[in-house]
Amino acid sequence: RYNIELGGENVTQAELDAAAEVTHVRPLVDRLEAGYSHPVSERGVNFSTGERQLLSFARALVRKPDILLLDEATSSVDTETEALVQDALHHLMAGKTSIVVAHRLSTIKDVDRIYVMHQGEICERGRHEELLAQRGLYWRLYQLQYAHQEGRSVA
């Protein structure tokens, strides 16, 4: 419990449970012998990378920040966990100003504005659909990441 409410003020059990549900932490908590009271090793080494990521999202959700800064939120997770992380991010970022650094474009395709950086400079900006239509660097990166999934060029 302490690990999720860390830094949150007066977090109720209902808020804790709601955060665990929308960030997909509930199955993890249910598997743990002591549930929310399960001891967490230093740096969370007793959890997988994906589990640590989802726990950090639950923690952020109960703190109710106005601004989120996310750096490679889906890095180092398997495909199944990435889907859970993406869904959790959707809930976490709703109604908040979010600055997201990402190489996996699936993490940012639904945001209001994307800034594409190349060699330290912003070279493109726009929404996902706009950037695909421009057929620039973002489009090329998207092709590299997703064309193989459909067996053809995307967009």
For the regions a protein language model found, what residue spans apply to each?
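ABC-family ATPase nucleotide-binding domain "signature/switch" substructure
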Residues: 2-10, 14-25, 35-135
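Nucleotide-activated donor-binding/catalytic signature segment of Leloir-type glycosyltransferases, i.e.
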Residues: 29
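C-terminal boundary and immediately downstream tail of ABC-type ATPase nucleotide-binding domains
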Residues: 133-155
